[in-house]
Amino acid sequence: MAVQQNKKSPSKRGMHRSHDFLVNPATAIEPNTGETHLRHHISPNGFYRGRKVLKTKADE
């Protein structure tokens, strides 16, 4: 079993945990529809970067 050699100071402990926080996912607004969607993903209406790339049931 591993045993620490020296006690980690509160400062070093905080630096070790600095990447453990949660981040909200990056979202974008589709210019045509005004909908919010994840960055680099198709919007629910089938638009990506202002262009229609996927047919939806509403189109048919």
UniProtKB/Swiss-Prot annotation:
Region feature Disordered, mapped onto this chain: 1-60
Disulfide-bond pairs as recorded: none
One GO BP annotation of this record: translation
InterPro entries: Ribosomal_bL32, Ribosomal_bL32_bact, Ribosomal_zn-bd
SUPFAM superfamilies associated with the record: Zn-binding ribosomal proteins (SSF57829)
Coiled coil residues, start to end: none
Compositionally skewed regions (Basic residues) per UniProt: 49-60
Keywords on record: Ribonucleoprotein, Ribosomal protein
Record GO terms (molecular function): structural constituent of ribosome
Cellular component terms (Gene Ontology): large ribosomal subunit
Superkingdom field: Bacteria
Pfam families: Ribosomal_L32p
Family, per entry: Belongs to the bacterial ribosomal protein bL32 family.
PANTHER family given in the database record: 50S RIBOSOMAL PROTEIN L32, LARGE RIBOSOMAL SUBUNIT PROTEIN BL32
NCBIfam families, sorted: rpmF_bact
Name by which UniProt lists this protein: Large ribosomal subunit protein bL32
Species of origin: Bordetella pertussis (strain Tohama I / ATCC BAA-589 / NCTC 13251)
Lineage: Bacteria, Pseudomonadati, Pseudomonadota, Betaproteobacteria, Burkholderiales
